[in-house]
Amino acid sequence: MLTDKFLRLQSALFRLLGLELLHEQDVGHRYPWRSICCILSVASFMPLTIAFGLQNVQNVEQLTDSLCSVLVDLLALCKIGLFLWLYKDFKFLIGQFYCVLQTETHTAVAEMIVTRESRRDQFISAMYAYCFITAGLSACLMSPLSMLISYQRTGELQPKFPFPSVYPWDNMKLSNYIISYFWNVCAALGVALPTVCVDTLFCSLSHNLCALFQIARHKMMHFEGRNTKETHENLKHVFQLYALCLNLGHFLNEYFRPLICQFVAASLHLCVLCYQLSANILQPALLFYAAFTAAVVGQVSIYCFCGSSIHSECQLFGQAIYESSWPHLLQENLQLVSSLKIAMMRSSLGCPIDGYFFEANRETLITVSKAFIKVSKKTPQVND
C-alpha cells in the first residue's frame, strides 16, 4: 500500500530513540531507556562545556566554540523534551494523517501526488540526516587524527576531544581518555539523533499536508458528477477534506510552534559558525564546521520551505474553486455558490506556520540568509 511508505525514514530514526510513531499507544515507549540515556548524555556533558568556556574567557575562539556547543545542547534537549511531553498528541496527529491518507489515495491522481511529495520529503530528510552524520563523524574522528599528527610532529601525545570540555581527572592516562572520548561521542549522538528525528518529522508531516491540499484542489476542479445529487455529494466531500486539512495544519503549527522559535538561536548560531569557519579555513576541523553549517542552514530551510509550501497550497484552493465548473451552479443552487464564496475567502487567509514572533516562510529564510552573508563578509575583517 502507498501508506506503507509513510514516515519510513522517520520511524527508523525514532526507533533508535526507543519510540514508535505508527504503532498502538501501549507499545509507544518500547525502549524508554534509550531516550533517557540520550537526555542524560547531553545534560551531563553541558557542565563540562560551560566549565571550558569559563576557563577560557580570554580566548575568543575557544569561548565561541563553547557557547556554540552549549547552544546546540540546549536546543537538542528542548526538542526531545517537547516531543516527549507532547508524545501522545504527536501520535494522535500522526494517526490522523495516516487515516486521511489511507482514505484519499484510492485514485491514480491522488497516488501520484502523495508519491511525489513523499519522495521529495524522504530525499530532503535523508540529505539533512547525512549532514548531521557527516558533522558528527568528522568531529569524532578529527580529534584522534589531530592527536596522531601532533605526535608525529612533536613526539608528545596531547589529548584532544571532539567538543570543548574539561574533566576532573587526568586525561593523559589512556583509561581516562577513553572514558572522556566515549562521553563526547555519546553527547554527540544525544544531540544529533533527537534533532534529526524531530526536524525530519516536521518535514514529512508538512509534505503530506501539502499532498492533501493538492488532492483537495484536484477534487475541487473535478467535482461535477453525473447528476445534481452526486455533484452535491462531491462538493460536500471536498469541503470536508479541505476543513480537515486546515485542522491538521492548525495542530501541526500548535505542536511545533515552540520549536520554530529556534530560528532566533539558529540565526545566532550561523553568525558564530561564520567566525569558526574563517578561523579554521586551513585546518582539519574545516570539514566539521562546513558540514555543521550545512546542517544548520538545512534546518532553517526545512522549516521555512515547508511552512511556505503549506501556506501556498492552502491559498491555491481558492484558485481551484475559481477554475472549477461553478457557473452552472448559479442556476441550480445559490446556497452552494455561497459556500464556494466562503471557501474562497477562507483560502485567501492560507494556513500560516508561525513561531510566535514570525512566520516560517521564504521571506524569513531570505532574511536569515542575508544576515548570514553580511556576517560572512565582515568576518575576514574581524580576523585581520
Swiss-Prot record:
Keywords: Cell membrane, Membrane, Olfaction, Receptor, Sensory transduction, Transducer, Transmembrane, Transmembrane helix. The chain crosses the membrane at residues 35-55, 67-87, 129-149, 178-198, 259-279, 285-305, 330-350. The keyword Transmembrane applies. Odorant receptor which mediates acceptance or avoidance behavior, depending on its substrates. The odorant receptor repertoire encodes a large collection of odor stimuli that vary widely in identity, intensity, and duration. May form a complex with Orco to form odorant-sensing units, providing sensitive and prolonged odorant signaling and calcium permeability. This is Putative odorant receptor 98b. Residues 56-66, 150-177, 280-284, 351-384 are extracellular. The lineage of its organism: Eukaryota, Metazoa, Ecdysozoa, Arthropoda, Hexapoda. Belongs to the insect chemoreceptor superfamily. Heteromeric odorant receptor channel (TC 1.A.69) family. Or1a subfamily. It comes from Drosophila melanogaster (Fruit fly). One of its GO terms (molecular function) is ionotropic olfactory receptor activity. Its main location: membrane. Interacts with Orco. Complexes exist early in the endomembrane system in olfactory sensory neurons (OSNs), coupling these complexes to the conserved ciliary trafficking pathway. Coiled coil: none annotated.
